[in-house]
Structures are given as structure tokens and as C-alpha cells.
């Protein structure tokens, strides 16, 4: 658990963070979102003491971080930044192994962990471990950055706009990768972004910041349904909130189940159980379909979702 109690940060006469109170529960993904200069990255960097806070308290699992050794604190927190921050003269494997080496892990344990994380992040160790960062695509390099942050198995993961410099397709793929990995590793994660759609997709809870203050902290659904101010309403968008709500619910919630599984046919339009209702509606409208088959991770049909059911539900 991470707790910020009336935390502020000043740069001279400028107040960057102003009396922030925030509790991030163990295992949840808290996304800090807001416009540029609102204090979200400053808030993140105070958690691992890259920046000292000017007032208030920051507690990690009940312990005041000012009583902790800052180097040890950072070694126990994964940290991912935009642009990866990889060492260009180190191989992929050595970049990932950096923190375990600093913690004096045995070589065999380090090698096994590097292979495990590369496989988890869809990077073939035999093909990529000996490469250097400049030999990777942007998406591959960002995956290596995430692997490095997870290498020592920290309880807390801090991510400062990690996908902000990537193209839209790579960004979406990495967002899906993060959701998949979070289901497996369950890290307490603080994620900074200026993209409300990214926040809605990734967050357990969202903290909306403006002028150094948190003006709403709630679940994605509650923020969409009950914005706390005009600023929040403008941030999430007034015209497409219904579509954003559809993006939060998976197809499995509204599909009609089948008892006889089958494999999909070549060229057939299908959906995965974890795909959003918004995507289902888009496919139906684009292809002029009344229903679409839904398949599980094993490629077996588990049900269908219909246009009528989506309209009936009203999401």
C-alpha cells in the first residue's frame, strides 16, 4: 500500500503539488491523469524519492519513506520511463539484469529471471538477449524497459508515461500486454499519462489532477458516470462517454453461451471474450452483422453477442 498524506512539492515560489491525499491499495493500478504541468509526474517521482516532498508524509506499507535508505527504496520499486532509459552499450539481457546484479543475486538465478521475463513479454531470449537497444524496435525496447523494472520482483511498479512516444498500434499492443501481465504478477502500480483513454483502459482507480491537486479519485466507471467537476467532464469528453463506458466492459459480460464449442472458420468475423463491447458494436456496424461469434483463448467458440443485447443492456 502507498499512502500520500497532505503531500506538497514546491520549486521556489511555484507549487507543483498542493496537499495531495491519496491511498493506493496493494495490487491495484492507480493512474494519475491530467494535462501537462498538473503535477502527476512530480507526484510519481516523490514516491521513490527521486524528488523530495516539501511537506506531508509518504508511507509505503505503513513506513515513512524518509526513514528508508533512498537507494534501497528505489531498488525495491520498478521504474519505467518514456523512452525506456536503457543503457545503449549493454545488451538486452544485461539491461534487464541490472537490479538483480546490484542485489548480488547468483548468476544462475539472474539468467533464469531474464529468460522468464523476456518470455513473459513476448521477446524470444534466443533472438533478442544478445542484441543492443539500438537494434530493437520502439515496442521491443519498451518491453525491455518493463522487463528491467520487473526483474527483481518488486512489490511496486512506477510508470511515467511509458508508452507516450510510441505509435498508436504499438501503444495499444503494449497496453494489452500490461493488462495481461498485471493479471499474472499483481503489482501495486502507479501509472502516469495525459491520455484519458489509456487511463480508462489500464486503471483500477484513476486520480485526476489539476493545478497540483487531486480533484477526483475513483473507478473508471464512476468517473465516467459521475464526473466531479467541469474539468473532469471536459477531460473525459462530453460526447462519447457512452462509448467509453462500452470500452470498460468485456464481451463475455453480454454474450449468450454455447454448449458446443467449435473452431473459427477462415475469414469469419470473430471476437475474443476479453474484447470490449465497444469493439463488438463497431464490428457489427462496420460489417452489417446482427451478431458475432465469441471465442476463448484456446480458439474455441464459447458464445455469441448480438446487437440487440447490447442495445437492450444500454451499457
What are these regions (language model features)?
Residues 92-101, 111, 115:
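Short helical segment in ABC ATPase nucleotide-binding domains corresponding to the A-loop/adjacent helical element
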Residues 217-218, 226, 304:
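ABC ATPase "signature
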Residues 64-78, 102:
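ABC ATPase NBD coupling module
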Residues 108-127:
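Conserved ABC ATPase "signature" region
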Residues 131-134, 152:
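Conserved signature/switch motifs of ABC ATPase nucleotide-binding domains
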Residues 48:
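Helix-to-loop junction immediately C-terminal to a conserved catalytic motif
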Amino acid at each position: 500500500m502507498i499512502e500520500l498524506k497532505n503531500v506538497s512539492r514546491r520549486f521556489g515560489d511555484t507549487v507543483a503539488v498542493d496537499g495531495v491525499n491519496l491511498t493506493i491499495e496493494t495490487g491495484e493500478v492507480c493512474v494519475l491523469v491530467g494535462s501537462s504541468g498538473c503535477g502527476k509526474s512530480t507526484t510519481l517521482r516523490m514516491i521513490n524519492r527521486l524528488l523530495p516532498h516539501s511537506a506531508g508524509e509518504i508511507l509505503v506499507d505503513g513506513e515513512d519513506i524518509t526513514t528508508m535508505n533512498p537507494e534501497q527504496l528505489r531498488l525495491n520499486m520498478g521504474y519505467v520511463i518514456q523512452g525506456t532509459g536503457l543503457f545503449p552499450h549493454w545488451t538486452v539481457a544485461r539491461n534487464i539484469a541490472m537490479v538483480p546484479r546490484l542485489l548480488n543475486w547468483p548468476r544462475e538465478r539472474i539468467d533464469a529471471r531474464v529468460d522468464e521475463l523476456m518470455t513473459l513479454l513476448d521477446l524470444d531470449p534466443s533472438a533478442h538477449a544478445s542484441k543492443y537497444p539500438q537494434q530493437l524496435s520502439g515496442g521491443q525496447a519498451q518491453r525491455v524497459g518493463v522487463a528491467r523494472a520487473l526483474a527483481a520482483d518488486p512489490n511496486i511498479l512506477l510508470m511515467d508515461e511509458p508508452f507516450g512516444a510510441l505509435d498508436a498500434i504499438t501503444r495499444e499492443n503494449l497496453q494489452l500486454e500490461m493488462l495481461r501481465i498485471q493479471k499474472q504478477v499483481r503489482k501495486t502500480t502507479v501509472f502516469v499519462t495525459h491520455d484519458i483513454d489509456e487511463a480508462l483502459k489500464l486503471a483500477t482507480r484513476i486520480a485526476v489532477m489539476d493545478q497540483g491537486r487531486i480533484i477526483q479519485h475513483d473507478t473508471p466507471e464512476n468517473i465516467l458516470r459521475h464526473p466531479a467537476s467541469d474539468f473532469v467532464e471536459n477531460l473525459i469528453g462530453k460526447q462519447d462517454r457512452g462509448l467509453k463506458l462500452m470500452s470498460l466492459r468485456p464481451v463475455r459480460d453480454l454474450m449468450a453461451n454455447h454448449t458446443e464449442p467449435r473452431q473459427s472458420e477462415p475469414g469469419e468475423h470473430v471476437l475474443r471474450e476479453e474484447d470490449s463491447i465497444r469493439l463488438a458494436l463497431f464490428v457489427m456496424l462496420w460489417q452489417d452483422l446482427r451478431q458475432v461469434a465469441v471465442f476463448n483463448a484456446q480458439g474455441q467458440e464459447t458464445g455469441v453477442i448480438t446487437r440487440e443485447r447490447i442495445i437492450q443492456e444500454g451499457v
